């Protein structure tokens, strides 16, 4: 098969790495890809959201199967375009992608189909939102309704912080159209968990759990990011909890989407809070998490391509995947200043040495080759140093040994990825 992966991040490098080993894969392309992806796929100079350019490339290369990594092209309707052209693809239609593209759509679906989530209200008026926040008190959560690259959520510890987040979205227009309306939601206390399922419109194939770290600094301090690290499996996940999540959240959502006439095909990513009242949905995403995808691909022992094709063909019912019992942990190396402004074009050395370390893989995100062939940072999140270990403690130790092998004066990382699980393991 001629395969095209859409995207340029660490998630897409991990997907390309996994897909490249499939016996079904003859040629693998990635649009636009990055410096790391180029080792396993042919990178194509077409942007992930350039739908016209992508359709031209698909036709020219007679692509058999398209895998869409990021949410942007999904919400814009790339899958709809591919379906119209008769090209097999993996991902939800624009209508189904509203699960991520509109938080109010998801909240209304949860209310209608009894999917457990926090109480909320939607606002586009500053005064009304402020009055609601004053009535409810803090802590409270303020979210941009649309896509904001993982940065549109404020967990406000004070009323003042919540009101400032409202002003950011509705007055300052920080998130553009994505923040033209907001969701104000009850604060859920507990432990966060990421759960993934590959869906074919009717069936859901559950994948292992993962836990990510959104805050930029150690100790979960600082603003939220797209994710600074992750590990899988998450020790908080028990057999009983997994069954509850599958029944009350994942399968209930898949059935709800089918009933609404917008069947969901693709990766359903449930961001959950495990509370004293059981699992509660924080948000849905309609694609693999980044960096959670990297730890999942590190543990996958089966053929990913076969599973994605089965989902596209609505044939997931009896499908299964095998996973390594070891723990995978990834540490994100980011450019100094991220998630705010940061320098581009800084040089990174010794990445190949880190990649060659035992049970370690370096997935590239914001990287490119300079004119001399040197590896350069061109994004905020730049490298994902990923390792396997017998425990979270072991995987963490191995990952940070590889992190320390990389020479990049202009980058930083969190030094505590996996801290909850390590604390559990060490009693």
Q: What are these model-predicted stretches?
A:
Residues 1-95:
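ATP-binding N-terminal substructure of ATP-dependent carboxylate-amine bond-forming enzymes
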Residues 4-5, 99-181, 235-252:
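Active-site nucleotide/adenylate-binding loops and adjacent lid/helix of ATP-dependent enzymes
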Residues 21, 36-38, 90, 112-114, ...:
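Solvent-exposed alpha-helices and their adjacent loops that cap or buttress functional pockets
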Residues 50, 367-372, 376-427:
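Generic C-terminus detector
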Residues 53, 129, 161-164, 339-342, ...:
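Short, conserved charged micro-motifs
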Residues 156-293:
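Internal nucleotide-binding/catalytic subdomain
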Residues 246-268, 285-357, 370:
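Active-site "cap" helix and flanking loop/linker of ATP-utilizing ligase/carboxylase catalytic domains
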